[in-house]
Amino acid sequence: MEKSPEHCAEGSPSPATESAPSATEPPLPSTEPPLPSTEPPLPSTEPPLPPLPPDFEKYWKSVQAYPEDFNTWTYLLQYVEQENHLFAARKAFDAFLAHYPYCYGYWKKYADLEKKNNNILEADEVYRRGIQAITLSVDLWMHYLNFLKETLDPADPETSLTLRGTFEHAVVSAGLDFRSDKLWEMYINWETEQGNLSGVTSIYSRLLGIPTQFYSLHFQRFKEHIQGHLPREFLTSEKFIELRKELASMTLHGGTNDDIPSGLEEIKDPAKRTTEVENMRHRIIEVHQEIFNLNEHEVSKIWNFEEEIKRPYFHVKPLEKAQLNNWKEYLEFELENGSNERIVILFERCVIACACYEEFWIKYAKYMENHSVEGVRHVYNRACHVHLAKKPMVHLLWAAFEEQQGNLEEARRILKNIETAIEGLAMVRLRRVNLERRHGNVKEAEHLLEEAMNKTKTSSESSFYAIKLARHLFKVQANVVKARKVLSNAIQKDKENTKLYLNLLEMEYNCDIKQNEENILAAFDKAIKSPMSIAMRVKFSQRKVEFLEDFGSDVNKLLDTYNEHQKLLKHQDIVKRKAENGLEQPEAKRLHAEEVSTAASVPVTTASMDATQSGYNYGSWYQYNYPANWNFGQYYNTPST
C-alpha cells in the first residue's frame, strides 16, 4: 500500500546541507505577434508579484539544470515549505508535479499549503489535479474526501450530495484496486453515519464481488449489518417488495397458503413478522454467499501475485528484478484470464509502480490497440511526455502508431521531440528519414540525411550517414552520379573506413557492368591505394582480379592487375615477417583493434539505448565473403625479376 506522503523522497537530505548557484528563470518566448495598439495602454490592475525567498533562486536553478535528479527537487520543496512562501511554493510544486505526478504525497502537501493559507478553492483544485494525474491512488482519494468533510458546510443540503458523488467517483476510479479496502470502508462508514442503511447494503453488494485484500472481512461485516438491522431499514422499498414477492412465491410453491402482503404493509402477526424477517435475512445472506464464494475463488488465483508486490506505489529508485518479473507474470495471467476492466486496472497499477520502465508502457499500449485508439494515445502521451521523456523506443512506437492511423504530422512531431531531447540519436533520425521516404517525400528524406551527415562530430559518424545518403540517392532516387559523389567525398574525409569502399563498390557493381567498367576499376583503385591495412588492400586487390577475370573487356588490364596483386602479396609477406620478428604489431591484432574502434564509433546515443540497438545492426549490409588467396600461377607465368 502507498506508504507515507514522503515515500517519493526516502533518505532525502535537508536543504540546509546542500547549495546550488543562483540564477533567474528565463522568460518564455511569445508565441503570438503583438497586435498594433491604437490607444495608450491602461495601467495594470494586477498586484505586483511578491519577492521570492532569499535562497529560492539557487534551488530553482539546480532543478532546472538537473530536472531528473529527484533529490534536487526535494531540497527545493523542503525549502519552500519551511519558508511558508505561497507564491514560491506554487511555482515549485507545479514544476515538480509536472515531472513526478505519481508522487501522491506531494499533491497532499501542496493542498495542505493552500488550505493553511485559507485558499480552500485553490486547495480543492490541487486535489482535483492530483486525482486526475493518479486516479488509482486510494490514499489521495481518501485525503480529498476528508478535506471535503472538513471544508463543506454540513448545514448545506448539497453537501451530502457532493460527498456521495465524490465517494462514487472514488470507488469507480480506484475501487477495483486489490488494496482499495479502506476506501470502501470509508464509504460504508460515511453512509452509516448518514443513516442510509440501504445505501450501505448496496455498497456491500458491489464490494463482495470485487477481489480485494480483505474480502473475507467485508463479508463478515456484511452479515453483521444484515443481522443487526431490519430488512425495511437496509433495503430500498423496491428491493423489499421484490424480496417479499420472491419469498411469497417460494412459500406458495411449498404448499402454504398464508396471507402475505404484496406491498410494504406490515404483517400484523408478530410470529409471522419475525419469520419473514429471518427468512429475508437468510435469503439475502444466501444470495451474497454465492457471490462471496465466486469472489473467493478469483482472489485465490491472484493472491500469490499480490503477495509478491512489495512496492505498489511510485518511486524513482529501481525495482528489484523479482518485483519486475512478478509484474510481468501477473500481467500475462490477467491477459489470459481476466476481463478488460480488470486488465486495464492492473496495467494502471503496474505503470505507477513501474513508471520508469518502457516495456510496461509499451505492453499497455499494445494491449489497448485492440480496444481503443484514443486509449492507445492516452497511454503513449503519459509515457512520452511525463515518465519516459528520454526513452526512445516508446516514442518510436508511438510515432509508428500515429503513422498507421494516417496522422503524419503527429508522427513527425513525436520523432522531432525525442530527437531534440536526445541529440545524435541515429535510430530516430533514420526513422524520420524513412517516414518521409514511405510517403514520397524523397527530397525531405535526402535533406534529413545530409543534415545529419554535416552535423556529426566524428568522421566515422559522418561516414555512417554518408553511406545511408548514398544508398538513398542510388536506390530511391536513381541518382548514381550524386551517390558516387557523396561516397567519394566521404572517403576523402575518412580514408581508412572499409565500409565506404565496400559500399562504393557495391553501388558500382549494381550498375550496368559493361558500361560502368571504368568506374568499378576506379573504385577498386581507391581502395587498393588507400591507407587501409595491407591485409584489407590485398582483399580488394583479389576482388579486382576476380572482376577482370569474370567481366573485364581487356586482357592487358587483367595481366597488369595480376602483376600488381603479386607485388602486394609480397609486400604483405614482408610486413608479416617483420611482425613475427617483433619489429611491427601483428597485422591480425591491429585489424581486430581497428574493427573494435570502428564498431564503437557507429553513432547510436546513450548508454541506456543498448537494448534498442540490436534492431539497427547495419553491419550485415557491408559484409563480403572473400575467398582464400587464389593461385593464379596455374594460369599465368610469374614475371621474371
Curated annotation (Swiss-Prot):
Disulfide bonds: none
GO molecular function ontology, one term from the record: pre-mRNA 5'-splice site binding
Localisation per UniProt entry: Nucleus
Positions with biased composition (Pro residues): 24-50
One GO-annotated biological process of the protein: mRNA 5'-splice site recognition
SMART domains xref list: HAT
Region (Disordered) location: 1-50
InterPro entries registered for this protein in UniProt: HAT (IPR003107), TPR-like_helical_dom_sf (IPR011990)
Record carries keyword Endoplasmic reticulum: no
The keyword Nucleus appears for this protein: yes
GO cellular component terms, semicolon-separated: commitment complex; U1 snRNP; U2-type prespliceosome
Coiled-coil portions: none
Composition skew (Low complexity), residue ranges: 10-23
Residue windows of the HAT repeats: 50-82, 84-116, 118-150, 158-193, 304-336, 338-370, 372-407
Pfam families: HAT_PRP39_C, HAT_PRP39_N
Keyword entries, A-Z: mRNA processing, mRNA splicing, Nucleus, Repeat
Family statement drawn from the similarity comment of this UniProt entry: Belongs to the PRP39 family.
Chain's role: Involved in pre-mRNA splicing.
Name this polypeptide is given: Pre-mRNA-processing factor 39
Natural source organism: Xenopus laevis (African clawed frog)
The gene coding this protein: prpf39
